[in-house]
Amino acid sequence: MKNDTTTPSADAFPVERHAHWLLRLGLASVFVYMGIDKFMGSGVAEFSAMMNLPVILGFLVALGEIGTGLLVILGGLIKNRLGDAITRLGALGMVPILLGAIFMVHWGQWHFMSTASHPLGGMMFQMTLAMVAIYLLAKGNKA
């Protein structure tokens, strides 16, 4: 059988198998940071009040952000079906958190810069994060 020279082999791009970490670490670091940040300063109570949420729900959002970020990282470290499931579970948990942020805070403005009508900015950043989360949900550890 003849070797197909038009298709590059995995050996031609040895870093390709690690490229998924760019998506994982970028997405997970934002989630873990935002989750931890909700416990700092004025904390979960102020976040909950700003979002018109019960404090317990604000607490669960903060824990969800930390947990889903850690799951996406952990899933990438485990090279079997369990790791794939952990990656997908983490990404699945991120989607409703991001949709909540988009629809409750950022909807109506695309650009991320703050304005008088959207002091926390528009939904560009959250939509990008949602697309990365959906990609990891769809691809799992085959990303």
Label the predicted regions.
Residues K2-A143:
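Membrane-interface extramembranous regions
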